[in-house]
């Protein structure tokens, strides 16, 4: 072993494993690029992003920590969201929550026929965020 060397497993790292996923379509209606980070409460994202906000309440992007999704002006793409875990309290961002998540507002797809369900049983291998915003 070399000092400072990091030896990692040769398997893929699974993130947000066993968290229900919701896929929504988002369009940047503004005239400037918008970037949303991995832990940003998507419900509170820039007002120039047009999407069904209530479906994003209590959720963040299903991407690795430190990553982001960028929306160029006029871009329309699908993104995959997962619920916050832990104590389920949100502070800061645009100040729209600043406290515990109101569980009655969290969209949880349960109907297989729901066009927004986007719930996959394969632990993220169908994650639309990994495919440039397009579901295959």
Swiss-Prot record:
Pathway: Nitrogen metabolism; urea degradation; CO(2) and NH(3) from urea (urease route): step 1/1. Coiled coil: none annotated. It is found in: Cytoplasm. This is Urease subunit beta. One of its GO terms (biological process) is urea catabolic process. Gene3D superfamilies: Urease, beta subunit. NCBIfam families: PRK13203.1, urease_beta. GO terms for molecular function: urease activity. It comes from Staphylococcus aureus (strain MRSA252). Signal peptide: none annotated. Pfam families: Urease_beta. InterPro entries: Urease_beta-like (IPR002019), Urease_betasu_sf (IPR036461), Urease_subunit (IPR050069). The gene is ureB.
């Amino acid at each position: 072993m070399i000092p400072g060397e990091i030896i990692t497993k040769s398997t893929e790292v699974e993130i947000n494993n066993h968290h229900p996923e919701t896929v929504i379509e988002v369009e940047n209606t503004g005239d400037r690029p918008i970037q949303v980070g991995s832990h940003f409460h998507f419900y509170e994202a820039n007002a120039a992003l047009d999407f069904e906000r209530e479906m994003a309440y209590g959720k963040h992007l299903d991407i690795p920590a430190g990553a982001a999704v960028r929306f160029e002006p006029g871009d329309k793409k699908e993104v995959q969201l997962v619920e916050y875990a832990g104590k389920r309290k949100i502070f800061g961002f645009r100040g729209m929550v600043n406290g515990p998540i109101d569980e009655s507002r969290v969209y949880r797809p349960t109907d297989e026929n729901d066009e927004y369900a986007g719930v996959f049983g394969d632990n993220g291998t169908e994650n639309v965020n990994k495919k440039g915003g397009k579901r295959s």
